[in-house]
């Protein structure tokens, strides 16, 4: 018991502190001083610390909100880009199909045009052949008539008199003129 009373007695012999200050010697500080310092820190530091945490929380929330807005805008832009891509792909397919159908149509038109040109050339060829045949036939007829006429004239000259000869010539000339009109 003497030790306990000595402790209280020795408390009375402490000198009073001349000023308030911090004791930086951790081993010389007692739990009462530590609890006072910790209490003061908690009391005054709580507001500062909570303000720091609130500011940090607001910055984090704002950053998250901004990130979500940016993400939403990026998603909207992505959807718009995808829609434009689908539209462009559809237009490209349409142009491709129109191009193929136009090529087929041009090919058919070219084939039809060539076919018509060949038909016209065939018709011109047939007309030319027919015309040449008619010309040759007319020339042959004319020569046959000329030879027949010369033969008839030769026979008439040897067999007929002048008067009969003149009548026959006039009749043949009339007949020859009628034949010429028919052939022309």
Swiss-Prot record:
Residue intervals passing through the bilayer: 27-49
Source organism, top-level taxon: Eukaryota
Cleaved signal peptide residues: none
The protein's predominant localisation is plastid
Q: What compartments host this protein?
A: Plastid, Chloroplast thylakoid membrane
Question: How is this protein annotated for GO cellular component?
Answer: chloroplast thylakoid membrane; proton-transporting ATP synthase complex
| Any GO MF annotation of the entry | proton-transporting ATP synthase activity, rotational mechanism
Keyword annotations from UniProtKB, A to Z: ATP synthesis, CF(0), Chloroplast, Hydrogen ion transport, Ion transport, Membrane, Plastid, Thylakoid, Transmembrane, Transmembrane helix, Transport
Keyword Transmembrane helix (UniProt): yes
- Name the membrane topology term: Single-pass membrane protein
Quaternary structure, from the entry: F-type ATPases have 2 components, F(1) - the catalytic core - and F(0) - the membrane proton channel. F(1) has five subunits: alpha(3), beta(3), gamma(1), delta(1), epsilon(1). F(0) has four main subunits: a(1), b(1), b'(1) and c(10-14). The alpha and beta chains form an alternating ring which encloses part of the gamma chain. F(1) is attached to F(0) by a central stalk formed by the gamma and epsilon chains, while a peripheral stalk is formed by the delta, b and b' chains.
Its UniProt miscellaneous note says: In plastids the F-type ATPase is also known as CF(1)CF(0).
What protein family is recorded?
Belongs to the ATPase B chain family.
- Role description: F(1)F(0) ATP synthase produces ATP from ADP in the presence of a proton or sodium gradient. F-type ATPases consist of two structural domains, F(1) containing the extramembraneous catalytic core and F(0) containing the membrane proton channel, linked together by a central stalk and a peripheral stalk. During catalysis, ATP synthesis in the catalytic domain of F(1) is coupled via a rotary mechanism of the central stalk subunits to proton translocation.
What name appears for this protein in its UniProt entry? ATP synthase subunit b, chloroplastic
